[in-house]
């Protein structure tokens, strides 16, 4: 049979308060780790160092690279250039953009100089 000192109301109250404090601390600690994981980050992928939006290029790649590849051969005859520009009007647009240096929609003598 337990002694009277072990079951006194003061000891029971202390045990109850101690249990409540332990449970409250455990709940606060669990909530803190859970909220730490749910914090919205400005750069969520920075933790993994994964590139974002730097993948393979699709068909949206500009055709100016094709024009540069064409001109990198350094020597293209007029007939070759005409044939290529007739087949690919997008390249013709790129040539016009290159010639129109001030982007006013007109090719002037100042643009050609």
Swiss-Prot record:
InterPro entries xrefs: EF_Hand_1_Ca_BS, EF_hand_dom
Keyword line: Amidation, Calcium, Cleavage on pair of basic residues, Metal-binding, Secreted, Signal
Tissue-level expression: Seems to be specific to the mechanosensory neurons of the central nervous system.
Residue span, EF-hand domain: 87-113
GO molecular function: calcium ion binding
Compartment annotation: Secreted
GO cellular component, one term: extracellular region
Signal peptide positions on this chain: 1-32
SS bond partners: none
Propeptide segments, given as residue ranges: 58-113
Binding site for Ca(2+): 100, 102, 104, 106, 111
Phenylalanine amide modified-residue sites: 54
Protein function: May function as an inhibitory cotransmitter acting in conjunction with the fast excitatory transmitter released by sensory neurons. The peptide selectively inhibits certain postsynaptic cells probably by means of sensorin A release.
Protein name listed in UniProt: Sensorin-A
Species, as recorded: Aplysia californica (California sea hare)
Protein's gene: PSC1
């Amino acid at each position: 049979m337990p002694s009277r000192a072990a079951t006194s109301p003061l000891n029971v109250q202390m045990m109850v308060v101690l249990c409540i404090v332990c449970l409250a601390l455990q709940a606060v600690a669990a909530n803190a780790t859970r909220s730490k994981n749910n914090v919205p980050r400005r750069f969520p992928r920075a933790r993994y160092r994964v590139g974002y939006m730097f993948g393979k290029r699709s068909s949206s790649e500009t055709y100016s690279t094709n024009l540069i590849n064409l001109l990198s051969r350094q020597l293209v005859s007029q007939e070759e250039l005409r044939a290529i520009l007739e087949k690919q009007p997008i390249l013709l647009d790129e040539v016009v953009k290159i010639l129109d240096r001030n982007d006013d929609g007109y090719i002037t003598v100042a643009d050609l100089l």
